[in-house]
Amino acid sequence: MALAAPLHELAEQAAALGTRIAIETMPFSAISTVPMGAEIVTAAAHPAAGLLVDAWHVFRAGTSLDQLRTALRPEMIFGVELDDAAPEVIGTLFEDTVDRRLFCGEGVFDLIGLVQVLRDLGFDGPWGVEILSTSYRVLPVDQALKQAADTALTVL
């Protein structure tokens, strides 16, 4: 587990400064799934090392809710980002993640199931909405914020 030692070292530094380090997995990166990230966090063996769980990254990596349930412990989840997407990747995975995300409930991700799994595990940390989308970038900020909050509440 080559990344565990550097993560442990970063977590030590973060803890000394009163903060923590979270890995966010990406299906097109060296740490491509949440279960893979959980293995690295477990091997790093430091309470200041954890994961940021992003719905887009979970579902586009093909990770099942059962795999999440098996891989995660509540103390390793530092935050969750909610978002949705179309049934098929639009463009490359990178283009899909930075330009084509949808508000919660507007796509095909099982966000209610994801939220339930994380709650069943005991996660009680912060929930956020991460909508990276060319179509939403043109919205007035107050409208985008309201739509993000309103749609997120439908799955929380």
Protein language model features and the residues they cover:
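Active-site acidic/histidine proton-transfer and metal-coordination neighborhood
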Residues: M1-G50
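Soluble or luminal CAZymes and related metallo-dependent hydrolases
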Residues: A2-P6, S32, E106-D110, A144-Q147
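A structural motif corresponding to the C-terminal end of an alpha-helix
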Residues: E9-I21, G113-D124, V155-L156
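Hydrophobic faces of well-ordered beta-strands that scaffold small-molecule active sites
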Residues: I21-I23, A49-V53, F78-L82, G125-V129
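Short strand-turn motif at the edge of the Rossmann-like AdoMet-binding core
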Residues: T25-M26, W56, I131-L132
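Gly/Pro-rich active-site loop or hairpin
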Residues: V34-A38, T42, H57-D124, S133, ...
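A general structural signal for short secondary-structure boundary/capping elements
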Residues: R101, P126-E130, A149-L153
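C-terminal helical cap(s) of enzyme catalytic domains, especially alpha/beta-barrels
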Residues: V138-L156
